[in-house]
Amino acid sequence: MSILNLVRADLLNSQNYVPGGESARYRSHANELPWSPVTMGEYNLNYYPNIGLQIELQKQLAKRYQINSDQIILTRGSDDGIDLTTRLFLTAGKDAFMQFPPTFPMYAFYVRLQQAELIECPLDRRTNFRLTLDQIENSWKPNCKVIMFCSPNNPTGNLVDLNLIAKTCELYTNQSIIVVDEAYIEFANAPSATSLIGEFENLIVLRTLSKAFGLAGLRLGCIIAQSPIIQAFNKIIAPYSIATPSMELAKRALNNSDWFTKTIEQIKSSRAWVIKKFADNPIIEKIYPTETNFILIQTRFSKQLATWLARYGIAVRDFPSSSLLHDHLRITVGHDEQNQLLIDALSSFNADVAGLNYEKDFIY
């Protein structure tokens, strides 16, 4: 059985849109204006993005991720990759998508847009959200076309074991596409699932430049998979989907490897410092292990604390009262000044609850 049999049948034989005219001197085929009010280096912004620039950036990223250049395609951030995946594989009213909550809410959003079934396989906070193969097998159904791992997971911060990903790929060969969203993997002390791409044809890895690369404003990411799957994605990606300025700025930024190395180490160091300060705070009842640039904490004062921090201009992520994480906050590690303000604001909040003692369940 071909892995392409998992692609929606109505899309499998569709034709790619090929704009053409890339090398022509006079572009009389695309109805563009001959002038532009602004310029950007050698690129004419009055013209649609050049496919050559996209290929160059894909090759640059392929080298960084240690994959072949035919195993990658650009997206407008990870969200676009999630959207495209649900469109390519899920037939409305027929197919299902498995996720492991608490996790990134946009998975469920795009599944609903596609009118597919959502299979929930909840993680248990008592085990620090650890996932096992038994849990997956107990939740899987024959119509499950996509299994979505978020590693490290947002908002819990923990990794999915690479061996578990490999076993899942093997177990559901020709039955399910296994997707690994690695938006935060650069902050982790662990190998990427891209190392498994050559081994499993049903594996897709999503990467982004929005987090560790500090380029969220460019809206750039990529889908990584074996070549046949990438070719299938090409059938549903709109032409000219990535803007010329985004690609050009990303190319320049990716040349600055020293900056990325230094920045990631700085975040890791700051993360350790913030965790230590949290551990000394009596209102924080639990600190979860994290392999990301954020920290998940448990506190019975979550709603009050979020409101308190907002007075200092600090926005943190809290969760609905109906959520498993209703008494938790997700807090991003920032620069030194931002981190110090956070700790100072927490200390001032403590003054309002001084004298109260709570048992803590610290991981660190």
Curated annotation (Swiss-Prot):
Q: Which cofactor does it need?
A: pyridoxal 5'-phosphate
Pathway the protein takes part in: Amino-acid biosynthesis; L-histidine biosynthesis; L-histidine from 5-phospho-alpha-D-ribose 1-diphosphate: step 7/9
Q: Name one GO molecular function term.
A: histidinol-phosphate transaminase activity
Keywords (alphabetical) are: Amino-acid biosynthesis, Aminotransferase, Histidine biosynthesis, Pyridoxal phosphate, Transferase
Which residues are annotated with the PTM N6-(pyridoxal phosphate)lysine? Answer: 211
Q: What class of enzyme is it?
A: transferase
Which GO BP annotation is one of this protein's?
L-histidine biosynthetic process
What EC number(s) does the entry state? 2.6.1.9
InterPro entries registered for this protein in UniProt: Aminotrans_II_pyridoxalP_BS (IPR001917), Aminotransferase_I/II_large (IPR004839), HisP_aminotrans (IPR005861), PyrdxlP-dep_Trfase (IPR015424), PyrdxlP-dep_Trfase_major (IPR015421), PyrdxlP-dep_Trfase_small (IPR015422)
Q: Which domain of life is it from?
A: Bacteria
Q: Which reaction does it catalyse?
A: L-histidinol phosphate + 2-oxoglutarate = 3-(imidazol-4-yl)-2-oxopropyl phosphate + L-glutamate
Q: Pfam families per the record?
A: Aminotran_1_2
Gene3D superfamilies per the record? Aspartate Aminotransferase, domain 1, Type I PLP-dependent aspartate aminotransferase-like (Major domain)
Q: What does the record note on quaternary structure?
A: Homodimer.
The family database entries (HAMAP family) matched by this protein are listed as:
HisC_aminotrans_2
Q: Which family does it belong to?
A: Belongs to the class-II pyridoxal-phosphate-dependent aminotransferase family. Histidinol-phosphate aminotransferase subfamily.
Report the protein name in the record.
Histidinol-phosphate aminotransferase 1
Q: Which organism is it from?
A: Legionella pneumophila (strain Lens)
